[in-house]
From Swiss-Prot:
Homology family: Belongs to the UPP synthase family.
Enzyme class: transferase
Superkingdom classification of source: Eukaryota
Gene Ontology MF terms: transferase activity, transferring alkyl or aryl (other than methyl) groups
Keywords: Transferase
BP terms from Gene Ontology: protein glycosylation
Pathway(s) per entry: Protein modification; protein glycosylation
Annotated EC: 2.5.1.-
A single Gene Ontology CC term: cytoplasm
Keyword Transferase assigned: yes
Co-factor(s): Mg(2+)
Protein name from the UniProt record: Dehydrodolichyl diphosphate synthase 8
NCBIfam families, A to Z: uppS
Length: 272
């Protein structure tokens, strides 16, 4: 019995080593072409995944989704993508049943606090976490946890991850316009008109470059009120794969599509 376990363990180690080598080769080939500066993910399909797999519990699909987050971030880091934006919880999601909302938010808090422990132990592998959205609408414990995690990881630079929580473009624009007006009034420049740059500087996501590739899982064609201002020149890639099903090859295919469309995307940028 012990020999069997040892053999399984050795096989697992060999398999993982081979997979790591394969990824390194694939990513080296990918890096011959342009790599997106910021990939944004609209993580759709957790509930459908749970239903498809007959998983029990309101948070079952979302727990599976968190596993995908871990792997996708690792792949992006290995490829050399400097920024990743995750649409974790939109303002419209608060319209779901109160029991489900509480379940998802509790799970998210659990993962944030677990990541805090990792950051304290120095196990973040150079990943910086930034939370963006109407964080004031969240409970005090959640806000405190997000603030602490951002502080603990603010010096990390290998991969910068923006997690959009309590987020919608509509709310973001209202917030940005209001803050822009307040800034101008405080500087005594309230008489001048607002410039586009004034508003963009006050956006929740202004700390990172705008996305140049948006990946939506679950077969949807909509942006669902996610960064519609910032993604006007981005490539939208949709996949039928549900978020917990998203894997290495889905990501590689999305980046290859981005590379094939590069001439078109550059022409669009020059028009703005």
């Amino acid at each position: 019995m012990n020999n069997t376990r040892e053999e399984v363990g050795e096989f697992t180690q060999i398999f993982n080593a081979l997979m790591s080598l394969m990824r390194k080769f694939i990513f080296k080939v990918l890096r011959v072409g342009p790599i997106p500066t910021n990939i944004s993910f609209i993580m759709d399909g957790n509930r459908r995944f749970a239903k498809k797999r007959n998983l029990e519990g309101l948070d079952a699909g979302h727990r599976a989704g968190f596993i995908s987050v871990k792997y996708i971030l690792q792949y992006c880091k290995e490829i050399g993508v400097p920024y990743v934006t995750l649409y974790a919880f939109g303002m419209d999601n608060f319209k779901r049943g109160p029991e489900e909302v509480k379940c998802v938010m509790d799970l998210m808090l659990e993962k944030v606090e677990l990541t805090i422990d990792q950051a304290v132990s120095g196990n973040m592998n150079g990943v910086r976490i930034i939370f963006a959205g109407d964080l004031n609408s969240l409970n005090e414990r959640f806000r405190a946890a997000t603030k602490k995690l951002m502080e603990l990881t603010e010096e990390n630079r290998d991969l910068i991850v923006v997690v959009c929580v309590a987020y919608s473009t509509s709310v973001e624009i209202v917030h940005a316009v209001r803050d822009s007006c307040v800034r101008k009034s405080k500087t005594g420049d309230g008489s001048s008109a607002l410039e586009l740059s004034d508003i963009e500087e006050c956006m929740y996501t202004s700390v990172v470059p705008v996305p140049d590739l948006v990946v939506r899982t679950g077969g949807g064609d909509r942006l669902s009120n996610f960064m519609t201002w910032q993604t006007s020149r981005a490539l939208l890639h949709r996949t039928e794969a549900l978020w917990p099903e998203l894997g290495l090859w889905h990501l590689v295919w999305a980046i290859l599509k981005f590379q094939r469309m590069q001439d078109y995307l550059q022409k669009k940028k020059k028009l703005h």
